[in-house]
């Protein structure tokens, strides 16, 4: 295939697509250039169906540091495991693509996005999402796309598509919306307490922009797209399916309607084990035994899936007996743990999360060194999901993509209400431990995080709560569910998480299993979520009505002082000598930022006060008219040098020592004497003049004689106008200065 180039303009930047030049052995590949960001996307498919009961799709987003002209960090100087941002971007691309493959498709598919050059003002993640859809669409892989995604901002009341970095910093909204040309199928957002109306408007305008990108993709597919390959889809034997449904559907229906999770799982497992045993015996010697038993398992799964959906759409009954807009029982607890800086335990039905707060000096902030310029991350929210939370055994180790994603969602939701660095100069870490799970654990972690922050004395603007909404749709009719549990998440069509305060939304996340949802469904889901959010906030506020005014006794205390930027080097000292000495003497921790904000941390307030005094002394500046108790450190003919404080000296000229004439400095002061002086002048070079006599009473004027006349002055000798006396040069103290 010869190289072809396609070009358009999108959101004020040039969008160029190149095909047929690189990675030609992949099923489909494209180079996407957006602004000066360049992403290579390659899509490949295995030749045969993979084993397993799920679609093995893998999406990678690779950040190459050379793309930003940077060296990788670390000893190896080579890219290693994906960064958190790269992992989140890969998930962001995976989620709108996954629903676009046929039910029963089991061939392994890999989509690899490599960032080759990076322009911080032209979104590489959005270029990668565009490239992923296009590479699949022009390939022979049976992908029912295209899809596209855009970033949406909200600045000065205006919705902006793919905002620049400067606009993003000013934006009240950080939204990614993706979908087909017909509907939205993925949402990820953080927001500064925006209303449901603004969020809906942003979603719909984002989708209009998505349609533009899809039209461009369709143009390219028409020009270079391959014919789709015919692949085997996983299907079950129709006769076997009819036989099992007729014999066992009523038993499974009864089991599904058991309200308590563990009891329901046990009841359905009894039915499944019974059916499995019957068919294992019946087909024990059959040459296709493995296929038949795979079909039996799949049929039972489909029966359970169908019954859950039927109950909700037809009978309006949920597996646990709740109404469609009803929340499970709620419970909130603070101070669950001693010694820690704050803790909250939140329970919603059989979902439970423990959140633990840790406060630390700003030196503990996380340094993020990726494709963007290096920056420090002050707030971290980490989410852990141990297998015991669902009563199972399983893998233990580093957090997976799901845990990273759920942690990031909670981080976005809570970050919007945190105090500024000036108000609360701490690094903040929340860790959510999921102790039980029956759906919506990420939202439970947000609620528990709010409890921990408030109990720990972090002055958040308002409490935040989260709720997960679900959807059951049969094409013509739909039902929106509030507070979905595990079974409804597994067999439902949507998982729409909404977090926020009473004033507005702080985070959204939506994943669906169908190809899109309408504005009508979004509107209804947001309205139901708002009602549920307020109910949860009622419980949180009843548990802890206000943020505590004091930190935990175990939390580090802090004091801050502001110094001039040019004084930072004085406090740090050569090679850190001065600051290290202060830390060693007082036992505190000290952080200094580039703007001269000095933060002093310790559990001992006296140590903080001592360190503060030392630093204040180091950066203290003399001021005109201020009085100091100074020490004489050097004597010259023209005056004495005195130390005002620390390394700051001043000159007291001999003429400023007393109101009477003095010929010798030593007649008035000696080295080591302490004297009171007043600063009278500081020149442009910072040299300080001080006066002793300015603090002394001024002597009275010469007295009058008895007649009230002034005493006569001694007469100066007069010289004849032609007489020129010999000039004598005498060095005065001021001349010698």
Swiss-Prot record:
* Protein name, as recorded: Polyribonucleotide nucleotidyltransferase
List the record's Gene Ontology CC terms alphabetically: cytosol
Which GO BP terms, alphabetically? Answer: mRNA catabolic process; RNA processing
The cross-references to InterPro entries, in alphabetical order and at most eight, read: ExoRNase_PH_dom1 (IPR001247), ExoRNase_PH_dom2 (IPR015847), ExoRNase_PH_dom2_sf (IPR036345), KH_dom (IPR004087), KH_dom_type_1 (IPR004088), KH_dom_type_1_sf (IPR036612), NA-bd_OB-fold (IPR012340), PNPase (IPR012162)
Q: Which residues form the KH domain?
A: 556-615
Q: Which UniProt keywords apply?
A: Cytoplasm, Magnesium, Metal-binding, Nucleotidyltransferase, RNA-binding, Transferase
* PROSITE patterns found in the cross-reference section: KH_TYPE_1, S1
Per the record, what are the reactions this protein catalyses? RNA(n+1) + phosphate = RNA(n) + a ribonucleoside 5'-diphosphate
Instruction: Kindly give the Pfam families that the UniProt entry links to this protein.
Output: KH_1, PNPase, RNase_PH, RNase_PH_C, S1
This chain's source organism reads Streptococcus pneumoniae (strain CGSP14)
Could you tell me which SMART domains the record lists for this protein? KH, S1
Mind listing the GO molecular function terms for this protein?
A: 3'-5'-RNA exonuclease activity; magnesium ion binding; polyribonucleotide nucleotidyltransferase activity; RNA binding
């Amino acid at each position: 295939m010869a190289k072809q180039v396609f070009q358009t303009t999108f959101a004020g930047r040039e969008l160029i697509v190149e095909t047929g030049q690189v990675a030609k052995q992949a099923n489909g590949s494209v180079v996407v250039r957006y602004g000066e960001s360049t992403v290579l996307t390659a899509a490949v498919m295995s030749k045969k169906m993979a084993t397993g009961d799920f679609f093995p799709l893998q999406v990678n987003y690779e950040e190459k540091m050379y793309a930003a002209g940077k060296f990788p960090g670390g000893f190896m100087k080579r890219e290693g495991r994906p960064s958190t941002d790269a992992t989140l971007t890969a998930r962001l691309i995976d989620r709108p693509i996954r629903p676009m493959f046929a039910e029963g498709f089991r061939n392994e598919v890999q989509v690899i996005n490599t960032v080759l050059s990076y322009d911080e003002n032209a979104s590489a993640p959005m270029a990668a999402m565009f490239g992923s859809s296009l590479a699949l669409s022009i390939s022979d892989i049976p992908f029912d796309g295209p899809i596209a995604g855009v970033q949406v901002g909200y600045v000065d009341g205006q919705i902006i598509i793919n905002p620049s970095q400067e606009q993003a910093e000013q934006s009240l909204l950080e939204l990614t919306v993706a979908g087909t040309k017909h509907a939205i199928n993925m949402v990820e957002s953080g927001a500064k307490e925006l209303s449901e109306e603004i969020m809906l408007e942003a979603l719909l305008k984002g989708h209009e922009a998505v349609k533009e990108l899809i039209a461009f993709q369709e143009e390219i597919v028409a020009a270079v797209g391959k014919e789709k390959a015919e692949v085997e889809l996983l299907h079950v034997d129709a006769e076997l399916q009819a036989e099992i449904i007729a014999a066992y559907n009523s038993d499974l229906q009864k089991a599904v309607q058991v309200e308590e999770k563990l009891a329901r799982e046990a009841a359905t497992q009894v039915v499944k084990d019974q059916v499995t045993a019957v068919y294992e015996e019946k087909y024990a010697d059959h040459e296709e035994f493995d296929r038949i038993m795979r079909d039996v398992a799949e049929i039972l799964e489909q029966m359970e899936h169908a019954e859950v959906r039927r109950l909700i759409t037809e009978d309006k009954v949920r597996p646990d007996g709740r109404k469609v807009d009803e929340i499970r029982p709620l419970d909130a607890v603070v101070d669950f743990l001693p010694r820690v800086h704050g803790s909250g335990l939140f329970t919603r039905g059989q979902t439970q999360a423990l959140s633990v707060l840790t406060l630390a000096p700003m030196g503990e902030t996380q340094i993020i060194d990726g494709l963007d310029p290096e920056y420090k991350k002050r707030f971290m929210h980490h989410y852990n999901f141990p297998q015991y939370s669902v009563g199972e055994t399983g893998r233990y180790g580093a957090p997976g993509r799901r845990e990273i994603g759920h942690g990031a969602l909670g981080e976005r939701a809570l970050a919007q209400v945190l105090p500024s660095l000036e108000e609360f100069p701490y690094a903040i870490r929340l860790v959510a431990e999921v102790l039980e799970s029956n759906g919506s654990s990420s939202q439970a972690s947000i609620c528990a995080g709010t409890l921990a922050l408030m109990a720990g004395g972090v002055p958040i603007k308002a409490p935040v709560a989260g709720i997960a909404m679900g959807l059951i749709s049969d094409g013509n009719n739909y039902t929106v569910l509030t507070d979905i549990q595990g079974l409804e998440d597994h067999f439902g069509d949507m998982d729409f998480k909404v977090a926020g305060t009473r004033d507005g939304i702080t985070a959204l996340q939506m994943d669906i299993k169908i190809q899109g949802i309408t504005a009508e469904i979004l509107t209804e889901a947001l309205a139901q979520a708002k009602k549920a959010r307020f109910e949860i906030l009622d419980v949180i506020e009843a548990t802890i009505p206000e943020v505590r005014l004091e930190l935990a006794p175990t939390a580090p205390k802090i004091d801050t002082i502001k110094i001039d930027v040019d004084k930072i080097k004085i406090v740090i000292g050569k090679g850190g000598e001065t600051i290290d000495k202060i830390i060693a003497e007082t036992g505190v921790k000290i952080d200094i930022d580039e703007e001269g904000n000095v933060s002093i941390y310790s559990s001992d307030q006296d140590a903080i006060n001592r360190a503060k005094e030392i630093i204040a002394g180091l950066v203290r500046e003399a001021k005109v008219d201020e009085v100091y108790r100074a020490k004489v450190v050097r004597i010259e003919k023209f005056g004495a040098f005195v130390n005002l404080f620390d390394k700051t000296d001043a000159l007291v000229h001999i003429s400023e020592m007393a109101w009477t004439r003095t010929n010798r400095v030593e007649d008035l002061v000696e080295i080591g004497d302490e004297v009171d002086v007043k600063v009278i002048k500081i020149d442009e070079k910072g040299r300080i003049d001080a006066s002793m006599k300015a603090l002394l009473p001024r002597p009275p004027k010469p007295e009058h004689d008895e007649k009230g006349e002034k005493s006569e002055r001694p007469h100066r000798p007069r010289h004849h106008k032609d007489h020129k006396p010999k000039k004598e040069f005498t060095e005065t103290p001021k001349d010698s200065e």
